[in-house]
Every structure is written in C-alpha cells, then in structure tokens.
C-alpha cells in the first residue's frame, strides 16, 4: 500500500515518462520488483524488507484513472438516456441514421447496386418516408408493420442470356444479377396503422403514415 504523501510525485513521474516515451523505461521494467542496495531497508525487529523506491511501481495511477474514467462514462450514459427519453431523442437518431445512409450511398465501393437513399420527415400530421429504389417495381417491394417497426423488403432478380455471336461460339452465356434492400424503421406509438399508404412510382417509394392525434382532431366552433 502506497503512502498518500508519495502518491502525488509518483503519479506525475509516471505520467511524464509514459507521455514522453510511450511507456515505462526499459531499465525500470527489467528491474521491476527487484530491490536495490540503496533503497533496501531491513527492520531488525521484524525482519521484513521494505523498499522506498517508487520508480519500479508501475500502473498504480492507472487503476485510479480507469476507475474515475468508468464513472464519467456511466454518468454520460445516464445523461444520454435522460435526454433520449425526455427530449424526443428519436428524431435526432433518425437524422443520424439518414446521414449514415447518405454516406453509405455516396462512398459505397461496391459496383452496381448501391444502398438506396432514405428520407424521413416527421410533422404534426404524420410521417413521410421516401426511399429511392431504382430498378425495382411495386411487385418487387413488400412492406409490413409489426412490433412498432415498419419493415421494407425489396428483391429483384435479373437473368440475362447471351446467345452465340458466331458459329465458332456455340455455348450461350448466362448472367444473373441480384438487387436486395432491407430496412426497418421504428415508428412512434401515436400512429394510425390502418391508414398507412404506400405508392411506388418510377423507382421511388413513398410511404405516408398519419398520426392518431391529427386524425382524431375536430374543429370546435366558438358560439
């Protein structure tokens, strides 16, 4: 157990060496746990050997630092959960998801079919979802709603058969391409599932989801 009076200089000594050299000196590591003649003191009454050299005591402050760091992480997670559930964090997460979808669409390294863009707009009336699905028709798209999730599945298979171009080439070639898209969108609880509408036109899927609060609203005349 280290004394409190020697904890502070040991901390700054270790922090300086680790920060400047990226680790402990080789001399300290090679002599770790070995008391030297200058630092070894023997108690005649008990016969216990003690060393006062703290340069060979690695990772003392690291345990304290990791403990404090984990407490800060727990506090951050608690604040994030409070913000998410109390201040409508779902809409911010939807925005982040839209940004990542755009990045995936722009920087995708795969050739051919790339991840379609998805736009989600929420208002007092309801939710409007727009998905770009080039090369798909309405027969290739399936939409279902379960457990608060709107699931969009699109699958398109194309088979191309190339006939022999000359008498020497008597074997025909066949090429098959597969385009698949799956996405699940978390919807709020105040929506009317029975009034969900989906329209597919020129490779663009538009989904309209009204909210219960807007559908059930009535106008009251003032007399």
Swiss-Prot record:
Concerning CDD domains, the annotation shows: ACD_sHsps-like (cd06464)
Its domain of life? Eukaryota
**Where located?**
Mitochondrion
Q: Which residues form the signal peptide?
A: none
- Principal localization? mitochondrion
Give a GO molecular function annotation for the protein: unfolded protein binding
Identify the keywords attached in UniProt to this record, alphabetized. Mitochondrion, Stress response, Transit peptide
Q: Which Gene3D superfamilies match?
A: 2.60.40.790
A Gene Ontology term for the protein's cellular component: mitochondrion
Residues annotated as domain sHSP: 109-223
Residues in coiled coil: none
Q: Which InterPro entries match?
A: A-crystallin/Hsp20_dom, HSP20-like_chaperone, HSP21-like
Where is the transit peptide, renumbered to this chain?
A: 1-23
Gene Ontology process terms (BP):
protein complex oligomerization; protein folding; response to heat; response to hydrogen peroxide; response to salt stress
Q: Which family does it belong to?
A: Belongs to the small heat shock protein (HSP20) family.
The name this protein carries in UniProt is Small heat shock protein hspI, mitochondrial
Which lineage ranks, top first, belong to the organism behind this chain? Answer: Eukaryota, Amoebozoa, Evosea, Eumycetozoa, Dictyostelia
The protein's gene is named: hspI
